[in-house]
Design a protein with these regions (language model features):
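Acidic/polar, solvent-exposed loop/turn segments
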Residues: 1-295
Length: 295
């Protein structure tokens, strides 16, 4: 901007000066769906080897990995872009890391994720930066600050905060800040099969057999399985891939071999001469409190 001032007196004498002001545009961070944050969603239930793999209408569109982007308005300027502590450079409209242009084939991994990995995969000519986030570990949904604080488990498909990466964009005109935030859809246990091979058990017959199949889902750490039958509660403990159930103070027992279960009734119930209705109730509770239950 050139500001030119001219003073002319009554008989035509002139005094004149000019001042030049250079303008520098301030950068802007534009996230989606909100301007201050680029928000993406992943699904805990689809973490390979951990998740339950079950889907609901809320979880169907999402996987363990997701793509996202944010846009920088640089007004043609070069810039330093810092994502989660990793420094990138914009020079002549291209994005670089340590002198190498960032592309899908030369992506940059951003360390520091609490539950997954963030990878920057490139930049478009309009300043849109693309990234991929992959969820690798489950997120404890109990009392999560971003999801109903203090209300316990979130339930299958409820969103909880998994990660956040601060973004700063610096040019000669100033600094803009934003954030990449990642939500994870909570997994839940699945009790897929509970069935018996007998519809009746004769008085004097001790064993009740059947099939029990379940998975605690991604939040398997700290998961609990209980079996309630004829006034007794059996609690399961997993070791070396197998579940062992303890309980039965009346001499009864519950065993699970793979998916085949055997409930051994106490002698007091097999010889009482009465018709009994046996209700077998199984409850699977995952590490952050989600429940699957069948009888």
């Amino acid at each position: 901007i050139i500001l030119k001032v001219t003073v002319t007196d009554g008989d035509g004498d002139i005094a004149q000066q000019s001042v030049t002001v250079n303008t520098v545009a301030v950068p802007l961070f534009e996230g989606a769906p909100s301007g201050g944050s680029s928000v993406v969603t992943t699904d805990e239930g689809n973490i390979p080897g951990m998740g339950s793999g079950t889907e609901t209408p809320a979880t169907q569109p999402f996987g363990a990995a997701t793509d996202g982007s944010f846009r920088m308005q640089l007004h043609g300027a070069d810039a330093t872009v810092t994502i989660g502590g990793t420094e990138l450079k914009v020079e002549n409209g291209k994005l670089y890391h340590n002198g190498v242009e960032v592309t899908a084939d030369a992506a940059v991994s951003v360390p520091g994720g609490a539950h997954g990995t963030l990878t920057v995969t490139g930049m478009d000519a309009d300043g849109t930066v693309h990234y991929t986030y992959t969820l690798t570990t489950p997120v404890d949904a109990t009392g999560n600050a971003s999801n109903r604080p203090g209300e316990g488990d979130a339930g299958r498909g409820e969103a909880v905060r998994a990660d956040a990466f601060d973004v700063s964009i610096t040019t000669t005109g100033g600094t803009a800040t934003g954030q990449i935030t990642v939500d994870a859809l909570d997994d839940a246990p699945v009790l897929s099969t509970l069935d018996t091979t007998q519809t009746t058990v004769a008085d004097g017959e001790a064993a009740l057999t059947g099939t029990l199949s379940f998975t605690p889902g991604a939040d398997a750490e700290g998961a609990q399985v209980t079996v309630e039958v004829e006034g007794q509660t059996f609690t399961g403990t997993k070791a070396n891939g197998e579940w062992t159930f303890t309980g039965g103070s009346d001499g009864s027992s519950f065993q699970l071999n793979g998916t085949a279960f055997t409930y051994t009734r106490p002698a007091s119930n097999t010889t009482d001469g009465r018709n009994d209705t046996i209700i077998l109730k199984v409850t699977v509770t995952d590490g952050d409190g989600d429940i699957a239950q069948q009888s």
